[in-house]
């Protein structure tokens, strides 16, 4: 919901999980992923108040609950599904926390990349492809390459 800069989903136990769309009005914090504070901040209340605009019965509890964590993202917000410079090591990274919805196709992509390498084909030279059965097209996996050029016309978000 870009009007309130939040996304949410129900959680077990009559709870709701709320995330931020990282609006420009919020203070941005660059953190060291190996050394950062994962305690709640005043941003927790801001997110709860924003979500309460959509769910008035939500109310604002005085007991903070949930998780504070980081997620990985690439420069253009498109994931990397590719081999690495370490032989036999493949990557599915930079998913910006949204690719759980694409898990079946991500598995198909990774399977194709690994099979391509097992057949002694170099994905950097002759890119792997997968068949998209429902629409009858092939998908060239260079779009997800670690070596791809950043698309300057990207939305640089998961919102399209």
Predicted regions and their residues:
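Active-site lid/adjacent beta-loop-alpha segment flanking the redox-cofactor pocket in flavoenzymes
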Residues: 1-87
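C-terminal lid/capping helical subdomain adjacent to the catalytic/cofactor pocket in oxidative enzymes
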Residues: 85-160
């Amino acid at each position: 919901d870009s009007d309130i800069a939040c996304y949410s989903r129900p959680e077990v136990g009559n709870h709701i999980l709320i995330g931020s769309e990282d609006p420009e009005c919020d203070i941005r914090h660059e953190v060291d992923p190996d050394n950062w504070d994962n305690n709640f901040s005043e941003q927790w209340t801001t997110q709860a108040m924003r979500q309460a605009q959509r769910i008035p019965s939500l109310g604002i509890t005085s007991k903070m609950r949930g998780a504070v964590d980081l997620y990985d993202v690439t420069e253009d917000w498109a994931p990397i599904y590719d081999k690495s410079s370490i032989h036999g090591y493949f990557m599915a990274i930079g998913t910006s926390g949204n690719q759980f919805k694409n898990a079946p196709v991500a598995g198909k992509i990774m399977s194709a990349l690994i099979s391509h390498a097992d057949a002694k084909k170099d994905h950097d030279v002759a890119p792997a492809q997968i068949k998209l059965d429902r629409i009858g097209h092939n998908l060239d996996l260079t779009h997800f390459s670690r070596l791809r050029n950043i698309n300057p016309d990207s939305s640089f978000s998961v919102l399209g």
